[in-house]
Amino acid sequence: MACGPGNGRACHEDGTMWGAPACLRAVGAPRTTRKKKNNNMLKVIFDTDPGVDDALALLYLHKHAQIDLIGVTTTFGNASVESTTHNALYLKQAWGFAAPVARGAAGPLQPEATPEAWPVHIHGHNGLGNHPVPAQLDVAADARPAHQLIIDLVRAHPGEVTLVAVGRMTNLALALQQAPDIAGLVRGVVLMGGAFHVNGNITPAAEANIWGDAEAADLVFTTDWPVTAIGLDVTTRVEMNRDGLDTLAALGGADAELVRALSQDYVDFYLQAGHKGMVVHDCCACIALTRPELFQFERASVRVATDGVARGMTIPKPEGMGFGPSVWDGHVLQSVAIGVDAAAVLADIEQTLKV
């Protein structure tokens, strides 16, 4: 919860709570840090719902030498879109990335859908693990809605932009509905979502990002553009414990220290759930872009169940497997991750965040 008038929380002059760690109090005015660009860099729009693991993924993209982060778009999911947008702007101010931040969808494509409860037991009441976030920031969101920013940037850089989507797929679906031509203009889509040969994490059938807007996810999977899906089949194998977070903070300075600080309750949740540390869901999707050799993939057409008890279930039809006529027929084959070198993924995060 942010400090401010009426909520009984005392603040420093910069708007942060008393007792906030130095990594927060030192944010101050927005920084701007720029990487030296080259022609081999991958242009990325990061569609996100920050979100604790989203923060780590965003820092990874910001720090990676071969990533040109050209846009950040927000959506509902780990918290309301108001909170996730504020969180993305806070991280922009703290870390100094230049990419515009655009506010996106507040709910799923289907307006009659039952509003979902935010996962406060995982990501805290503010989406960033209850880590104190200033109520007032010195950076502002782009005037365009997220789907329009996606359309504009993809059209401005045909064949060059990869969409890395780690929340509900609503912004991507809205962009496709408004501008179907972008499907032929993107370099690719990498998403964190789905449970293809394992159980889900919000229901036995469904992973949360897909369940939260199943119609949007089905559109994303069945559109004729290249999708790489990084689901629970692999992300749940990549766990970072407190020692790993401490190492990141030691290697990565103040930027990584902020990730360490806001991840503490998130680690607790996963330890209580039987894991060895926090599951690094979203950063896996980023690393599938920069280091695809660390993953094993199958090719499959994918459909998403959009109603009933299995709503949000991602159902692959593997390449070459024969069935009778079905709703999978005629749809493009996508890449679905089924294996991962977890140790190498964690090592790559450390190497990328190292100052």
Each predicted region: which residue ranges?
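Intrinsic, low-complexity polybasic segments
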Residues: 5, 18-22
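Short hydrophobic alpha-helical segments enriched in small aliphatic residues
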Residues: 8, 13-15
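Short Gly/Ser/Thr- and charged-rich N-terminal loops/segments
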Residues: 25-28
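Polybasic, lysine-rich low-complexity intrinsically disordered segments
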Residues: 35-38
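Active-site histidine-anchored catalytic micro-motif
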Residues: 40-90, 130-236, 242
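Conformational coupling and interaction surfaces
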Residues: 41, 60-61, 68-69, 211, ...
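Metal-dependent C-N hydrolase catalytic cores
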Residues: 85-156, 331-340, 350
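A residue-level signal for conserved active-site and pocket-lining positions in enzyme catalytic cores
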Residues: 101, 220, 286
